[in-house]
């Protein structure tokens, strides 16, 4: 059980360390924070906090820094969300593009760029898993006498355009009819569910247009059948190097290799719809043990689409970053309601 005085001292140490990046000593806390106790008392309390696992002592310093457990207690029990400036609020409102006009992946990329800019952190997006999505509609449009533009829309708003080659492109009225039949037969199916029986039935329904069916289906497959890890992308990768924690060439190389390993990055991110904060030892990827990751899901209605996360060192301004993340995700999910 940690008493109120220890909580006050721990909060002061964490806030000071977040601000300065320098290990904190008892004299610093006594001078800068009006806690009503002496430097000697603070020193004794800091020793207790270290014994309890809330503080650590760097090898080269007499001061203390928060441990992962200390940051966890701070986030869970002591944090106060920072009020955003009117400029920041305006930027959030005006930067997320209209959900009625753009497909989901463009909206998400715009949002990730906004988060990266506002927080000065690296933003990770686990995008909609398109090969697990359902077909919503397929539209065929004439490009020239032997080329058709195949426009696929999935249930989570992802749009894929592919040009296919055929012997001869039918007239527009016929293409509309073919598009309607293909959509009716494939709607609400995933790529894995489009089996030989489905293909056979589709060929029977479109007798005489088998060359179009046989060109459309492989195009759909190639559009949707992607490696799961390819659906992770980053924004603001270099932002991680704004923090002195990564001035060390070994740590910089390690974090860069992690950020370029999409499989590991995907494993880092919680699939929870709720906002989640993972700190240090709570992260099971070894290269991220000194990081913090804040993530939240985005969705259309009741359907979860993906996750957006921010990664940085443990020493981030949690009150500011969580405020920004909360407002941005609220605005994003409101925008996606229109999809």
From Swiss-Prot:
It comes from the Bacteria. One of its GO terms (molecular function) is DNA binding. Keywords: Repressor, Stress response, Transcription, Transcription regulation. InterPro entries: GAF-like_dom_sf, HrcA, HrcA_C, WH-like_DNA-bd_sf, WH_DNA-bd_sf, WHTH_transcript_rep_HrcA_IDD. Transmembrane segments: none annotated. GO terms for biological process: negative regulation of DNA-templated transcription. Belongs to the HrcA family. This is Heat-inducible transcription repressor HrcA.
